[in-house]
Amino acid sequence: LASITASGFAVLYMDKLNALVGRYRGEAHEDEMVGYYPLCAFGENRVAASIDTALHAFLPFPHVDHLHPDWAIALAASANGRQKLDEFNKKYGRRIVWVPWQRPGFELALMLRKAVEATPGCDGIVLGGHGLFTWGGTQQDAYVTSIKTIDQMGEFVQDHEKRAGRPL
């Protein structure tokens, strides 16, 4: 990312991307959705949009971080990850939501949107077996939330290992 310029990013109209929800025919037709992304392109921009485009776009926040830090993966991939996330939230006063593993794509994007809508005030999402989403009103807010979350998850995992004598 240090060397990429604006021309290297896919730029899409949000209203067109959101309109694709009406075209979505369900999980069995997941793969066809990526074919619609070029129809949402802004101007002459023809940079291919990522399979994860909708994951970021459907979250109602100005800045979204999608991360795969080791500490979050330790939590997300543990056999009892949802339970451990509940413990984490209680310990740190957080409201991070668990979304079970789902293949990346449109269905997962809709699951994330629904999770946020169903949990007003949530401050992150752990994707089971996958990673972490955090956000903020500005780039700086998103960054600070991401670092804070990763640091807290690291502390949580290490504390658990010390207490239990084994990893999560």
Predicted stretch roles:
Residues 1-168:
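Glycine-rich flexible loops
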